[in-house]
Design a protein with these regions (language model features):
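Short aromatic/basic micro-patch
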Residues: 26, 110, 150, 164, ...
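Conserved beta-loop-beta/alpha segment of the NTase-like Rossmann-fold superfamily
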Residues: 75, 81-146, 160, 167
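Residues at the starts of beta-strands that form the adenosine-phosphate
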Residues: 47-49, 128, 197
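Short, conserved active-site loop motifs that form the nucleotide-linked donor/cofactor pocket
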Residues: 3, 73-75, 156
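N-terminal glycine-rich phosphate-binding loop and ensuing alpha1 helix
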Residues: 1-59
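Conserved N-terminal catalytic core of the sugar/cofactor nucleotidyltransferase
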Residues: 34-98, 178
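Hydrophobic packing residues within well-ordered alpha-helices of enzyme cores
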Residues: 16, 61-65, 119, 139, ...
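Conserved alpha/beta core of the MobA/IspD/sugar-nucleotide pyrophosphorylase nucleotidyltransferase superfamily
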Residues: 81, 156-229
Length: 229
């Protein structure tokens, strides 16, 4: 099994209240990006990496790749206006010889090697697989400030990344999205629309997406606890 990895690292740090792009914010003395780089570098089935970064941060990303000791070929590209655009741009740079593509958000620095490998294994079997966790909170549908419906959570899962797919399936899904002007918040949504089976592998509650200062604080605490072990 040969896989390409994509790290989506083109997000801004605006909601974090930071001047630097989110992937370059430091946690425990290291950038968010560096955490994903080190995990990907440890997975033997991943043969190449494409990183989508904000315009002007290509050199900074290359320095992170070097510091992380990544030995596979790495391409760095400027991301698009939206996440979906960044992934589409990155897919075009992956090798057509790859069986699978695994997509990961740099804003989830706590994803583990185990989660990546589980996604890749499931995707090789089913066509697609994502990390996710069972929903813990009760959901309410609200209209005009009042509860309209309580949604049963028994079968609901909260999607995370990494998300892995057969390369041909992911390419076709993004091409279809362009042709039909489909906008989605993750790649699994686009792939599901093609009729491909997308399986779920259990992620981790620590694998949160850092969007707000409170998210950053949680991950900083997780990292500090690990460093103290």
């Amino acid at each position: 099994m040969n896989a390409s990895a994509i790290i989506v690292a083109a997000g801004s740090g605006v909601r974090l209240g930071r001047s630097e792009p989110k992937a370059f914010v430091k946690i425990g003395g290291r950038t968010m990006l560096s955490y994903s780089l080190r995990v990907i570098a440890s997975i033997s089935s991943i043969k190449e990496l494409v990183i989508a970064v904000p315009d002007g941060f290509e050199s900074a990303a290359r320095a992170e790749v070097t510091a992380a000791g990544v030995r596979i070929p790495v391409k760095i590209t400027c991301g698009g206006a939206e996440r979906q655009d960044s992934v589409r741009i990155a897919i075009a740079l992956t090798s057509s010889e790859s069986d699978l593509v695994v997509v990961h958000d740099a804003a989830r620095p706590m994803a583990t090697t185990k989660i990546f490998e589980a996604c890749l294994e499931a995707a090789s079997r089913a066509g697609g697989a994502i990390a996710a966790i069972p929903l813990a909170d009760t959901l309410k549908r609200v209209v005009d400030g009042a509860i309209r419906e309580t949604i049963a959570r028994a079968s609901l899962w909260q999607a995370q990344t990494p998300q892995a797919f057969r390369r041909d399936v992911l390419v076709a899904a993004h091409r279809r999205a362009v042709d039909q002007r489909i906008v989605a918040t993750d790649d699994a949504d686009l792939v599901e629309r093609t009729g491909t089976r997308v399986e779920v592998v259990e992620g981790s509650t620590a694998n949160i997406k850092i969007t707000t200062p409170s998210d950053l604080g949680i991950v900083e605490a997780i990292v500090a606890a690990k460093m103290a072990e």
